[in-house]
């Protein structure tokens, strides 16, 4: 049971340390052991994501108030460098936890995307980052009726709210094309998508090659329609992915970029997505029925 913030920190560290020991041969790096271990640094990152400490200056400053938990806090430059070097380890931790979750075995999923802006619109011409070298471009955030510069994050989420897979693409990429690429890595799924994923040809190919049933509500001008009951059920279920997107945009501030480079952005995305999976994993360990209530873990009463 997690009764306070220090309990939460202990649980996160133990899970991270145990999982990292399982994948140690894959992430082993040369050189002497640092005072702040990899497990400690990753735990600090993931806990910081859950608490909303998204800027490194804020993160390190906040951890100084809890130095009895993590006594060997690196300097900001060293912390930043080691965090980038450990981003693949963080993603492997996410994958290991995901595979051990019973919820990840759900064969019914949702697919959607959300904008990942990297530079404010008016600052793009003077930006000194490497964004354009890594295909950052202008795109439209339809729901917000805004143009942004950056990428889109495409998510495959189970009906229980677990992020099964993801893909980062340029901001102007088609949801349908990116979704097809993402789903092509999976088999035997039933996937609900919005109208951006309507394509009889793509749906047929996914079914034939991957046994994936891609289901969408047809546009009003299409001949073949579905019942109002199906439309209502479809829209009700799809609200779940809005919940997950809301968690990522709210608690994890995934649409706010504090990175100055593409690899810095990737590091932060891995950190946020791993933290989300970890929170669901902890809730399952604790036997909580409402396992999507993840904010309460980092802010216990």
Language-model-detected regions and their locations in the chain:
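Short alpha-helical elements
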Residues: 1-301
């Amino acid at each position: 049971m997690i009764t306070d913030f220090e309990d939460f920190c202990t649980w996160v560290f133990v899970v991270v340390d145990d999982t990292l020991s399982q994948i140690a041969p894959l992430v082993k790096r040369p050189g002497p052991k640092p005072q702040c271990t990899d497990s400690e640094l990753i735990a600090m990152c993931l806990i910081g994501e859950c608490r909303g400490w998204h800027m490194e200056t804020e993160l390190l400053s906040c951890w100084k108030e809890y130095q009895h938990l993590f006594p060997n806090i690196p300097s900001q430059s060293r912390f930043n460098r080691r965090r980038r070097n450990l981003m693949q380890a963080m993603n492997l931790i996410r994958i290991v936890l995901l595979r051990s979750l019973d919820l990840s075995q759900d064969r019914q999923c949702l697919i959607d995307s959300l904008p990942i802006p990297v530079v404010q619109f008016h600052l793009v011409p003077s930006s000194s980052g490497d964004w354009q070298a890594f295909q950052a471009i202008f795109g439209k955030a339809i729901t917000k009726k805004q143009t942004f510069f950056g990428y889109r994050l495409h998510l495959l989420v189970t009906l229980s709210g677990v992020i099964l897979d993801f893909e980062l693409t340029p901001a102007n990429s088609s949801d349908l094309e990116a979704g097809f690429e993402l789903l092509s890595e999976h088999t035997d799924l039933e996937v609900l998508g919005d109208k951006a994923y309507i394509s009889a040809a793509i749906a047929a190919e996914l079914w034939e090659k991957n046994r994936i049933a891609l289901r969408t509500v047809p546009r009003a001008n299409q001949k073949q329609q579905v019942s109002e009951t199906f439309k209502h059920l479809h829209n009700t279920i799809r609200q779940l992915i809005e919940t997950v997107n809301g968690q990522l945009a709210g608690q994890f501030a995934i649409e706010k970029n504090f990175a100055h480079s593409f690899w810095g952005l990737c590091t932060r995305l891995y950190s946020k997505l791993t933290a989300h999976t970890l929170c669901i994993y902890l809730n399952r360990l604790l036997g909580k029925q409402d396992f999507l209530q993840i904010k309460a873990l980092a802010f216990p009463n």
